[in-house]
Amino acid sequence: MNDSQRVSILSEALPYIQSFSGRKIVIKYGGSVMENDNLKKAFFRDIALLSSVGVCPIVIHGGGPEINNWLKKLEISPKFENGLRITDQKTMDIVEMVLMGRVNKQIVKGVNKTGSLAVGISGLDGNLIQSRELGDGSHGLVGEVTKINPEILDPLISKGYIPIISSIGSTMEGISHNINADFVAGEIAAAINAEKLILLTDTQGILKEKDNKNSLVEKMNLKEARNFIDKKIVTEGMIPKTECCIRALAQGVKAAHIIDGRIEHSLLLEIFTNSGIGTMIVA
C-alpha cells in the first residue's frame, strides 16, 4: 500500500469517525476470531483504535471451544440439543470458571497490551444480567435474559474504560445461567441505547442463497430480515443471530451488523468504510 492509498483510506474513514465519536457500539466477540492468534491480535487492535478515536466499544463474549476443551480435560462429555449446551450444575461450574476466570481475562489482557484500558466483568457483577431458565428448563442451567441493569457500565464508559462482559446471568436468588452471547449482546445494546450492535461470526453475513458466496445482502430492513426467516432463506445458526438483531432494533438500536470475523480488521472495515464488509440491518 502506497502513501496515497493510506491517505485515501483515512479520508474515507473520517466522516464515520466524526459521526460515531462518543457513541456506544456493542460487539459480540466469538467464533474463529477467538481461536486464531492473528485474528485475536487484529481484534484487540481494532477495539483499541475505536476507543482512541472516541467510540465507546462494549465487548460481549462467549467461549464455547474453550469450555469444551476444559470439559474434555475433566473427562466430562459436552452435550448439545438444538445447538444449545445441556448445562447441569457440574457443567455450569466449568462454564463460570472458563468464561469469567480465563476467557474474559485473556481478552482484557489482549486489549490492555495495545495501550487501551479494558475491565473484565460478568453479568453477575452489579446484577448486570438478570436471567431465568430458558423455556421449560430441559436444557438445565441455560438461561435467557429477563432484565439488564446497565448502571454498572456507565462509570466505566464515562472514564474511558472498555467493558469486557462474559455472558453469565443469574436469578435474584443467585442461580447462575449460561446465556447465548448473541442475545446478551443484543439486550445490552438495547439497554444502553447503543448506536450499533455488531456480531462477529464465521459467516460472510446474510446470504440470499445459502451456498452462493456472491449473494451477500449488504443492507436490509427489519421487514426483510423477518421475511428471510419466515421463508427459510436464513437457516440453522443464522436464525438466532438474525432474531437477536431484529429484537435489538425493535428496542431502539439504530443498526445491527452480522460480519465475518475470519477477516482481519473486519470490525473497522464494517464501521469506517463506505462499502462495509457484512450485512447491516436497519429499522
Curated annotation (Swiss-Prot):
Its main location: cytoplasm. Gene3D superfamilies: Acetylglutamate kinase-like. Pathway: Amino-acid biosynthesis; L-arginine biosynthesis; N(2)-acetyl-L-ornithine from L-glutamate: step 2/4. Catalyzes the ATP-dependent phosphorylation of N-acetyl-L-glutamate. It holds the Pfam family AA_kinase. The record marks K28, K241 as: Transition state stabilizer. It is an enzyme of class 2 (transferase). It is found in: Cytoplasm. The keyword Acetylation does not apply. Substrate binds at G63, G64, R85, N178. One of its GO terms (biological process) is arginine biosynthetic process via ornithine. PANTHER family: N-ACETYLGLUTAMATE SYNTHASE, N-ACETYLGLUTAMATE SYNTHASE, MITOCHONDRIAL. GO terms for cellular component: cytoplasm. It comes from the Bacteria. One of its GO terms (molecular function) is acetylglutamate kinase activity. This is Acetylglutamate kinase. Belongs to the acetylglutamate kinase family. ArgB subfamily. It catalyses: N-acetyl-L-glutamate + ATP = N-acetyl-L-glutamyl 5-phosphate + ADP. Its EC number is 2.7.2.8. Keywords: Amino-acid biosynthesis, Arginine biosynthesis, ATP-binding, Cytoplasm, Kinase, Nucleotide-binding, Transferase.
